[in-house]
Amino acid sequence: MAAGCCGVKKQKLSSSPPSGSGGGGGASSSSHCSGESQCRAGELGLGGAGTRLNGLGGLTGGGSGSGCTLSPPQGCGGGGGGIALSPPPSCGVGTLLSTPAAATSSSPSSSSAASSSSPGSRKMVVSAEMCCFCFDVLYCHLYGYQQPRTPRFTNEPYPLFVTWKIGRDKRLRGCIGTFSAMNLHSGLREYTLTSALKDSRFPPMTRDELPRLFCSVSLLTNFEDVCDYLDWEVGVHGIRIEFINEKGSKRTATYLPEVAKEQGWDHIQTIDSLLRKGGYKAPITNEFRKTIKLTRYRSEKMTLSYAEYLAHRQHHHFQNGIGHPLPPYNHYS
């Protein structure tokens, strides 16, 4: 299911902050934004199955708080089914039932990679090739070329977010993802275009913006239901909350692992921000916070600039089946 930021029916997930804050994209899945206030990654309004998440903090299709809304993915071509979270045993921790096993992908040293998983536990799955593929897909779409063929990286199913930032200050330009586990080849292809062209907080991307873009791919892992709303670590876990608002409606919202740390928030500030993003209007009390159902998760993230993308294409031959040459970087400047 794809997710948005602030809980609405069939929302999109975006991992960025509301458009009013200069960024966007948060969903009930994950999504990373930089520490800019615009990029409060991961707010999401989870509706039902088949919803998209705007992981940067906002509903992609309306809802409260200029966030992102969750909407069913159009033409979703990935597999893997939805993520099944085991119910929290009494007061224990529920684990993600559909987490892929033993993925093997290394992250190139020339790219920026971040993972909230414990170091050395396993190889990173996210890779620079995934960001290159996203750039390939967007480039081909904007220039009318045939879409790139099947990439060479793993096609295992993961919940994922694709985030676009632009300019030297890395302003949020689009961020949408899904908490449903999708096969990476089709999932990245779909959410590359969805985040670039259909994030309701921004106009569709144009060719002129390509040279200034940064692409981030986030893969979400290790989902755990917890009993205590404080049982998560700032900078390590992303969180998804579910609560009943003052009108008796169920709402959800999410922030990616990097959001709270980038914003300088503690646990309470993060929870309260998520409640507001999820549309909760009443005064927030400690008693109400205790009624929240919280799921924590981790993520792996890779970021690549357009210039790095061209360098990888030229020097590492990440062609991904494209049958046309990319023009030199100066062509766009």
From Swiss-Prot:
Is Phosphoprotein among the key words of this record? yes
List UniProt keywords, sorted A-Z. Answer: Alport syndrome, Deafness, Disease variant, Elliptocytosis, Hereditary hemolytic anemia, Intellectual disability, Nucleus, Phosphoprotein
Query: InterPro entries per the record?
Result: AMMECR1, AMMECR1_dom_sf, AMMECR1_domain, AMMECR1_N
Low complexity compositional bias, start-end:
28-37, 101-119
Q: Where in the cell is it found?
A: Nucleus
Secretion signal, residue range per the UniProt entry: none
Domain AMMECR1 span(s) in chain numbering: 119-313
Q: Which residues carry this modification: Phosphoserine?
A: S16
Q: Which Pfam families match?
A: AMMECR1
Q: Where is this region: Disordered?
A: 1-39, 101-120
Query: What does the annotation give as the result of altering G177D?
Result: In MFHIEN; creates a novel nonuniform expression pattern in the nucleus
Keyword Nucleotide-binding attached: no
Recorded GO CC terms: mitochondrion; nucleoplasm; nucleus
Associated clinical condition: Midface hypoplasia, hearing impairment, elliptocytosis, and nephrocalcinosis: An X-linked recessive disorder with onset in early childhood, characterized by midface hypoplasia, hearing impairment, elliptocytosis, and nephrocalcinosis. Variable clinical features include anemia, and mild early motor or speech delay.
Record's protein name: Nuclear protein AMMECR1
Q: Read off the lineage from the record.
A: Eukaryota, Metazoa, Chordata, Craniata, Vertebrata
Gene responsible for this protein: AMMECR1
